[in-house]
């Protein structure tokens, strides 16, 4: 397969003829919607899929909520080595907070397809946001952490999980060493029971980077303790921030360049976003809120509004602008 960028005057039939492939394959591979209009600048996968190729020749994992569409997960899971099921929380006493829907069907799909199901642990408060006070209580209190680890091992054994992903954000700077010690303790306990441990890391570019997202995580120590790490190389462009690429390649490169100085590259997984944002303009900090959209949805917005999709060479990201029915300007990254 190769990537073809749509030019003015293109149609699915014309592209299919140029590449000597069935039009149906272009429609299927790119999730095109009848009557199959295209946007100038749209990137299309063109060519026949090699059915003999190993779908897991790239080591890949993905996060999924328990309410994900059954059809979507069934289409995706053959390509995943690991499925990170999102998510379990915990209380101040170390009791588990279960996902909103039972995830047994997802674990069953993993087992059918040879994919490892991974329990994602998050410190969400009652408001659904990361709670650093909850983290502090866990990492500084052995009674709480022992209770939580007992509960985790029980559930993981009972449900058939293969590992755990520790996805903690906004860790207090003063809890940095305590968090590392908690991860080391978790790894020891999980290894005793045959489980692997990964840790999600905010995208740092230096050891002394300031900010609540960064100061509580020691790249070197966490990378040494965990079996693998996920660099969260996304969300530069975010719902309440100014319009920009979600994962600008120039910024991603800076994170990776630093990470490999602290962590064994063989342990590093790179986060790749599968979504974008639609910002109304002008952007007003504290007021403007972007709408989260999927990749296919973004293309449909461009088509419906006659927008040409452009490409930012520095960020290596597509974007476009359009006017909605009320005359409001928008930019999509």
Model-derived segments and spans:
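Primarily a LysM-type cell-wall glycan-binding module
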Residues: 1-21, 42-44
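Hydrophobic faces of well-ordered beta-strands that scaffold small-molecule active sites
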Residues: 60-62, 81-85, 117-121, 164-166, ...
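Glycan-recognition patch characteristic of GH18 chitinases/ENGases
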Residues: 48-147, 151
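Second-shell loop/turn segments in exported
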Residues: 12, 92-97, 134-142, 168-176, ...
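Glycan-binding loop/region signatures in secreted carbohydrate-active enzymes
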Residues: 123-130, 134, 276-333
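Substrate-binding surface in catalytic domains of secreted glycosidases
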Residues: 92-101, 176-304
């Amino acid at each position: 397969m190769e990537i073809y960028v749509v030019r003015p005057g293109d149609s699915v039939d014309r592209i299919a003829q140029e590449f000597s492939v069935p039009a149906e394959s272009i429609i299927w591979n790119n999730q095109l919607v009848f009557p199959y209009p295209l946007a100038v600048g749209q990137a299309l996968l063109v060519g026949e899929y090699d059915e003999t190729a190993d779908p897991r020749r790239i080591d890949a994992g993905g996060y999924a909520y328990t309410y994900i569409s059954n059809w979507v997960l069934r289409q995706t899971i053959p390509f995943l080595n690991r499925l990170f099921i999102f998510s379990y929380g915990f209380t101040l006493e170390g009791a588990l907070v279960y996902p909103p829907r039972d995830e047994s069907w997802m674990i069953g799909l993993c087992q059918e397809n040879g994919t490892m199901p991974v329990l994602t642990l998050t410190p969400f408060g009652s408001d659904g946001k990361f709670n650093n006070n909850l983290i502090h209580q866990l990492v500084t209190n052995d009674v709480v952490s022992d209770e939580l680890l007992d509960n985790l091992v029980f559930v993981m054994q009972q449900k058939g999980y293969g590992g755990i992903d520790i996805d903690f954000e906004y860790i207090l700077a003063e809890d940095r060493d305590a968090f590392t010690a908690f991860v080391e303790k978790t790894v020891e306990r999980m290894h005793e029971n045959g489980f692997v441990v990964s840790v999600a890391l905010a995208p740092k570019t230096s050891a002394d980077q300031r900010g609540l997202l960064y100061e509580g995580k020691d790249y070197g120590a966490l990378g040494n303790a965990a079996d693998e790490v996920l660099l969260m190389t996304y969300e530069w462009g975010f719902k309440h921030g100014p319009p920009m690429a979600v994962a600008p390649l120039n910024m991603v490169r800076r994170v990776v360049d630093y990470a490999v100085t602290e962590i064994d590259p063989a342990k590093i997984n790179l986060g790749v976003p599968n979504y974008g944002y639609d910002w109304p303009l002008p952007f007003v900090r504290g007021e403007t809120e972007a709408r989260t959209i999927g990749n296919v949805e973004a293309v449909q917005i461009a088509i419906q509004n006659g927008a040409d999709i452009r490409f930012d060479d520095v960020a290596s990201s597509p974007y476009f602008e359009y006017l909605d029915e009320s005359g409001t300007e928008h930019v999509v990254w």
